[in-house]
Each structure stands twice: as C-alpha cells, then as structure tokens.
C-alpha cells in the first residue's frame, strides 16, 4: 500500500526542510510548493491526499 502523497506549502526554507526531512525519514511521498499559486499547480497536477500549509 502506498503512503499518502503530501503537498507541503511553505515559503520558509528552514521549516520546509524540517518537514520534508521528517517525511523522508518515514518514507512518505511528498511534493513542495513555495506559495499558494505553486500549491494550486501542484495540487491540480498531482492530486495530493493531504496538504500541509501555514497561514
């Protein structure tokens, strides 16, 4: 069974690296986007199961 595909939307590189390092350590599949516009493009292209974003 594939783990869920997670879209990480984060503009702060240190926070993004912390999140993606943790996801990678647990063998999760993930995509990243730096902002809302990039998130919309990634979500429409890849249909993630979960979106993590800051407000």
Task: Indicate where each model-derived feature is located.
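Acidic, metal-coordinating helix/loop segments flanking the phosphotransfer/catalytic sites
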Residues: 32-50
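Conserved acidic carboxylate
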Residues: 10
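Charged docking surfaces used in two-component/phosphorelay signaling
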Residues: 17-25
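Non-catalytic signal-transmission and effector/linker regions of two-component phosphorelay proteins
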Residues: 1-7
């Amino acid at each position: 069974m594939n783990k869920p595909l997670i879209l990480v939307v984060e503009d702060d590189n240190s926070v993004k690296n912390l999140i993606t390092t943790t996801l990678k350590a647990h063998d999760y599949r993930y995509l990243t986007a730096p902002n809302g516009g990039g998130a919309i493009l990634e979500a429409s292209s890849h249909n993630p199961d979960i979106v993590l974003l800051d407000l």
